[in-house]
Amino acid sequence: MCIKAEKYIEWVKHCQCHGVPLTTYKCPGCGEQIMTQCSPEKEIRDSLTCCPWCSAVFFKQVKGAKVKASAVIQNQ
């Protein structure tokens, strides 16, 4: 397992231990499940994100527990 994936798993465990609300979505590059922090219900948070499994870079929008992810760059 790569360092990026290990750090991601540590982050998820930390969030779960501290009651941080998380939601799951699929990476647009590899289709693997990724967890991210929920936003307040009426707030949209967006960011460029890197998949911990395939390193694909994509644009992510989170509104409450709903996530929309669009591929930007995929490593070959």
UniProtKB/Swiss-Prot annotation:
It is found in: Host cytoplasm. Keywords: Early protein, Host cytoplasm. Its main location: host cell. Induction: Expressed in the early phase of the viral replicative cycle. Expression of early genes is repressed by viral Repc (latency) and favored by viral Ner protein. GO terms for cellular component: host cell cytoplasm. This is Uncharacterized protein gp6. The lineage of its organism: Viruses, Duplodnaviria, Heunggongvirae, Uroviricota, Caudoviricetes.
